Amino acid sequence: KQQGQRNFLKLAKERGVNKFLAFLNSPPVYYTQNGLATNTGRGGTANLKPDCYEKYARFLADVVQGVEQHDGIKFNYICPFNEPDGHWNWVGPKQEGCPATNREIARTVRLLSKEFVDRNMDTQIMINESSDYRCMFRTHETDWQRGYQIQAFFCPDSVDTYLGDTPNVPRLMLGHSYWTTTPLSELRNIRCQLRDTLDKHQVGFWQTETCIMGNDEEIGGGNGFDHTMKTALYVARIIHHDIVYAKAESWQWWRAKIGR
């Protein structure tokens, strides 16, 4: 299964990559409520059947073990939900989406943690691959159930969603740089607010996805290969602000080429 993706993993390993992160754009369609990998026709809750949470956790553990056994590649990290707070991911059938509330994420992570412990697996479970930094410390175009993520997962007072003492879950939040790159004043301000909240709860931070998209109006959007200095300086500015002000300990690019 997924031979193309697995071939890319092998090619990356052959070229010296030694850390691998897996993430989910959707649970398998046979576990989803609408039978699709998109969230079409639904709101901002997990597209996962109520009786399939345990099955989903077992599936993820099986995949991590299977890839290591068959391909010799160990997933060091796995994130069960990708951009669960995204305001785009229930609008229509355009894109795979993985919306979920903080409670649904916490339930899944606890089950996956137990599965890993039972199998003596040390793969780290990452949260939350947020689509927007603002959802990590407040709300933005969503309600409280999918916002305030740092507080929800790492403040002990959040008894329903606290994951700070969960095995295989590091004190680390993952987020994507999209939507917060302009204007310049907000580029810095949002990252300073993010860092203040992370520091308050003693949580680290990785920036795990960004690229030039059509909404990057300052440089005219991103299509094809763009080798211009204007775009290079724009990307450098994002990297600088993510590392200096948000103190990202890891910074990851998404797509090498953008096309329509």
Model-identified regions with their sequence ranges:
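Substrate-binding cleft and catalytic face of glycoside hydrolase catalytic domains
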Residues: 1-168
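Glycoside hydrolase catalytic-domain groove-lining segments
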Residues: 7, 114, 118, 122-125, ...
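A general structural signal for short secondary-structure junctions and capping/turn motifs
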Residues: 10-14, 196-198, 240-245
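Structural recognition of the beta-strand scaffold that forms the well-ordered cores
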Residues: 19-24, 76-80, 124-127, 171-175, ...
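Extracytoplasmic/secreted cell-surface and envelope-processing proteins
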Residues: 30-32, 87-90, 134-137, 181-189, ...
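Structural recognition of alpha->loop->beta junctions
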Residues: 72-75, 153-173, 231-250
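Catalytic metal-binding/acid-base residues of hydrolase active sites
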Residues: 84-85, 131, 174, 178-179, ...
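Aromatic/acidic polysaccharide-binding cleft in carbohydrate-active enzymes
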Residues: 204-260
